[in-house]
Amino acid sequence: MNVDYINMIREDITKYIQSNTLRVGAKQSLAIMPEGDIPQDLQIEVQPQAQLDLLALHTGSRSVRFCVSQAEDSRVSLFLLALGGDEVAQSVRVNLLGAHAECSIFGFSAASLSQKYSSDIVVNHAAAACSSVQLFRQVVSDSADVSFEGRVMVAQDAQRTDAQQSCKTLLLSDSARVHTLPHLEIYADDVKCSHGATVGQLSAEVLFYLRSRGVSLLRARQLLLLGFADEVVQKIPAKALRESITTLIAKKIAANA
């Protein structure tokens, strides 16, 4: 299915919504980066063979909740980026109700000062042969607090499920806090599921290598952090949008590296 990703630009999402519900009809495609506020509670219905790419960029305090229902052979990609605001809370519930549905959720957050960001993700595999990905990268500095809770539920009838989950966090200060809780709940036999969460610091060995090549310590830290964020940013399908998001992240990192 082809999507004109040039149209994944800032746009008023309200014209696609009725009664807080965004519907993508059968075999339709929609790629959008909403302009302005997203409804705090948004129901998303994706019908058979439909495709949705939705990017939510948070540069101010915000609380959002997405509830996604996917029919057979549908594909959804959600991009959740938290780069500003004292407090950002993101909640996503995905129900894969039809066979061969695919859902990918990519998240990046950079928290500093006393900012508090949270991501609460649940993907429910209710049908056979569905796949899901949760890929989150977090950078935490100063006295910021970031949490990630990701849950994958696989029903008894959801055979041939493929579910992957990964959350990695870099701590840049001793006072920064992170809470991660990946969780798998599996009732089927024929599945391929993995989950993992790591918390660490910038590699001293790589920093030393870069400095030995004449790169300043500050620039070396910035390069490593940009590479870390790029694991998520490169999943964004529109090149122009990737570049603008990278610029925003670089500004955030420059202030906190």
Give names to the regions the model predicted.
Residues 4-208, 212-215, 242-257:
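Conserved beta-strand/loop scaffold segments within soluble protein domains that form the structured core
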Residues 115, 137, 224, 234-235:
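Short amphipathic alpha-helical leader/targeting segments
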Residues 209-214, 219-230:
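Extended amphipathic alpha-helical segments enriched in small hydrophobics
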Residues 222, 237-246:
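Short glycine/proline-enriched turn or capping motifs at secondary-structure junctions
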Residues 228-238:
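Short arginine-rich
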